[in-house]
Amino acid sequence: VPTTKASFYARLGVLSPDEIITKLRGVNTPTGGFIEGADVHGFELIPTIMADAYPSGPATRDVFDAILEELLEGIRNAGDIDGVLLELHGSMVIENLDDGEGYILSAVRDLIGPNTPVVAQLDIHSNVSHQMVEMADVLIGRESYPEVDMAPRGRECADVLVRIIREGLRPTMALHQIPMMWGMNQVTAHSPMKEAIEELHRIESLPGVVCGSIATCFPLADVPDLGASVYIVTEN
């Protein structure tokens, strides 16, 4: 069953820039965390588009291209920006395109150039590719399933972006893909994910480590980058 334009409207729909701030302020979503971060740090958010669909088959190329162009047009119209915050999933598949997020990040990078930082928030069920890591400055994944930490992870993205812009943080990101598929229901309050997240937090406490994430993978996507992974961001 392909993901079509109707698939997006069946869930949360496609929100306009004006609707994004008003409808998602104070809501436990990554963008809700972006908004909180903007309020706390005192920077201006310029929303572009939000499009959210239930997981299904590959998205049709015309729908994907239309959504991506609206995102890019919003960035163009924003003028002289200091950075980009993106709420992505991490396992989007398009007709004849296996790495939707890698393509999105590449398109954003081509538009804004190499010196404007891009920080993106990902689902814990991500198939993280090397292209995604190469095109973003920082990727931060959610750490809970059920996913109750969406706003905190969005806030963390905003915090890291502020560190890059105002404090000169120079993030370096590394990805290790694990040849393993974990089931969709790896509850992080139970073993073995509980211990894996605890070890992740231990690594994050080490000097020079900015943040780290574990992706359990999205096992229903038949793509080359299918699989669990760990990605870590350090200072320079």
What are these regions (language model features)?
Residues 1-40:
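N-terminal amphipathic/basic leader segments beginning at the initiator methionine
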Residues 184-236:
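Hard-cation-handling environments
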Residues 31, 35-55, 63, 67-75:
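Low-complexity, highly charged intrinsically disordered N-terminal segments
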Residues 57, 61-68, 72-166:
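Active-site histidine-anchored catalytic micro-motif
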Residues 14-16, 47-58, 87-89:
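Gly-rich Lys/Arg/Thr-decorated short loops/hinges at beta-loop-alpha junctions or inter-strand turns
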Residues 38, 42, 75-79, 112, ...:
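Structural signal for hydrophobic packing residues in well-ordered secondary-structure cores
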Residues 1, 29, 147-150, 175-183, ...:
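Active-site catalytic microenvironments in core metabolic enzymes, especially phosphate/sugar-handling
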Residues 165-194:
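Internal, active-site/partner-interface "lid" segment
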